[in-house]
Amino acid sequence: MDSNEKLIKIIKKYRDAFQKKIEERKLEMECDNNEHYVIYNALGITDTEGYQIDLQQNVGRFLYKYAGSLLEELTISCFQSAFSDAKAKVKLANTIDKSPQNIEIDCLVENKAYEIKWKDATTDGDHVKKEHKRVQIIKDAGYIPVRLMFFEPNREQAIRIQSSLKKII
């Protein structure tokens, strides 16, 4: 199987899993208790609109998860095609504190530890602290951390956070 065929196979795998997850959630939602629609109604949202909002909120969560996982696997596959020594999902022990016990490098190529993000709009302070710790663990292990982000965030606060994360690498 050539590289293009391999990438297409990965895409199909994620597409099928994503579509299956949506269908499963639709079935689950048929049994949902929709008492919370009373609040939607109070805010001018009909039951039909409420269902669509709840469904799209679920689809959106799945979309972000599967989009990130898809792009990560495609990227790792490309690295492994280009670099015979590329290793995926390398775990390092947390040498700073007890939580988490390990951190994971998405793809390790020689001494470069790639973290692959399709889009990262996280804006909380806890995220920044975890990222500082992760980068320090990687550096302490003798690797160079590289953050590979395919799409930059759009919101001002997220842009500021991402800018601060770029400075620690």
PLM segments and residue spans:
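Conserved catalytic cores of phosphodiester-cleaving nucleases, focusing on short active-site segments
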Residues: F79, I105-W118
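Secondary-structure boundary elements
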Residues: Q80-A86, D140-G142
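Active-site metal-binding core of divalent-cation-utilizing nuclease and nuclease-like domains
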Residues: A88-L108
